[in-house]
């Protein structure tokens, strides 16, 4: 803007000093030559310019068509991608659902198996306890019987003869075997 202002100021100072003036003589100023030259340029150049503009217009239209085709292809690919995404999301949801179902089934199976194992171990422990109790009772009973026999034997040693003692012992031993 500043340059334009400076140019106007210089041009107006030239006009004011008389450096620039209008010459009305057509032949001296070459106005006719300039008009012929300008007309020839327009006449001859218009065809070339017209052809150039038509060619440029065709290139632009071709580029627009190509861009529209690429846009349609991109839109189609976008639709396909969206469809694939939806299908992938459905597959993912199905996989998640299957995984949750499988996890629940595995959890249930593990819990059931654990309960069964606990019941089996408890039953085995109870069975062992019953067996051990029976063994302990038998041992206690055997011990009590042997103590009683010892006591009776001691008491009878002083009162019974050897033959009578032997008969009592044989009878008691046969009862124990039964």
From Swiss-Prot:
Give the way it sits in the membrane.
Answer: Single-pass membrane protein
CDD domains assigned: ATP-synt_Fo_b
Please give the InterPro entries that the UniProt record associates with this protein: ATP_synth_b/b'su_bac/chlpt
Q: What does this protein do?
A: F(1)F(0) ATP synthase produces ATP from ADP in the presence of a proton or sodium gradient. F-type ATPases consist of two structural domains, F(1) containing the extramembraneous catalytic core and F(0) containing the membrane proton channel, linked together by a central stalk and a peripheral stalk. During catalysis, ATP synthesis in the catalytic domain of F(1) is coupled via a rotary mechanism of the central stalk subunits to proton translocation. Component of the F(0) channel, it forms part of the peripheral stalk, linking F(1) to F(0).
Oligomeric state and partners? F-type ATPases have 2 components, F(1) - the catalytic core - and F(0) - the membrane proton channel. F(1) has five subunits: alpha(3), beta(3), gamma(1), delta(1), epsilon(1). F(0) has four main subunits: a(1), b(1), b'(1) and c(10-14). The alpha and beta chains form an alternating ring which encloses part of the gamma chain. F(1) is attached to F(0) by a central stalk formed by the gamma and epsilon chains, while a peripheral stalk is formed by the delta, b and b' chains.
Remarks, miscellaneous: In plastids the F-type ATPase is also known as CF(1)CF(0).
- Quote the protein name from its UniProt record: ATP synthase subunit b, chloroplastic
Give the species this sequence originates from: Ochrosphaera neapolitana
Taxonomic path: Eukaryota, Haptista, Haptophyta, Prymnesiophyceae, Coccolithales
């Amino acid at each position: 803007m500043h340059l334009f202002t400076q140019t106007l100021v210089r041009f107006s100072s030239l006009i004011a000093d008389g450096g620039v003036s209008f010459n009305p003589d057509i032949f001296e100023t070459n106005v006719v030559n300039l008009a012929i030259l300008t007309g020839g340029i327009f006449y001859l150049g218009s065809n070339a310019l017209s052809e150039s503009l038509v060619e440029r217009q065709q290139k632009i239209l071709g580029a627009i068509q190509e861009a529209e085709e690429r846009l349609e292809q991109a839109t189609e690919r976008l639709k396909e991608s969206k469809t694939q995404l939806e299908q992938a999301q459905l597959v993912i949801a199905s996989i998640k659902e299957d995984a949750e179902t499988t996890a629940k089934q595995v959890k249930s199976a593990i819990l059931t198996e654990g309960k069964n194992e606990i019941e089996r171990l408890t039953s085995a422990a109870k069975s062992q306890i019953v067996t051990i109790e029976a063994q302990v009772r038998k041992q206690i009973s055997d011990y009590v019987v042997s103590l009683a026999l010892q006591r009776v034997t001691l008491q009878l040693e002083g009162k019974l003869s050897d033959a009578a003692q032997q008969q009592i012992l044989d009878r008691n031993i046969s009862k124990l075997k039964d």
